[in-house]
Amino acid sequence: KDKIKRIVNKNLKGPNFSIHLTAIGPYLQLDKEEFKKIEKISKKIKKFKISLIKYKLSNQKFTSFYVQVKRTKNLITAKNKFSKTNYIKQNKKYNPHISLFYGMADKKTKENIIKKLPKLNKFVTIDKLCIVDVNEKINKWKIIKTIKLK
């Protein structure tokens, strides 16, 4: 995973962030009570596999270059466990993906980079959940807490 992101970033020079799959968010305010609720839910989730589909491109900053992930029952079940927390619900259908680059770059450049990337593994195990403080205005991502899954 990190090798793939290094190749992409070397060519596109995007902001630095850890490889991740966003399940929920954002939260406008993450107070102590909400934080504890998220931690408690996270500790009940067991490791699970996700299915990787292919490299994908778009002309949107935060989905500019990513790995498309299949909407599996395991993934949706894990995501739905957080439905009673106070994150901002999105109006659009959940598009599970692993971002490789944030920013704008022309399609041809991104297509040429895909040719240099290794074939994707069919499955990847999700073995941890992270609570992340994100400031998209200044391209800053800070992991506040990592919870290992059983």
How should these model regions be labeled?
Residues 56-66:
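Short, basic/glycine-rich phosphate-binding loops at helix/coil junctions
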Residues 60, 127, 131-137:
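Glycine-rich beta-strand-turn "strand-cap" elements at beta-sheet edges
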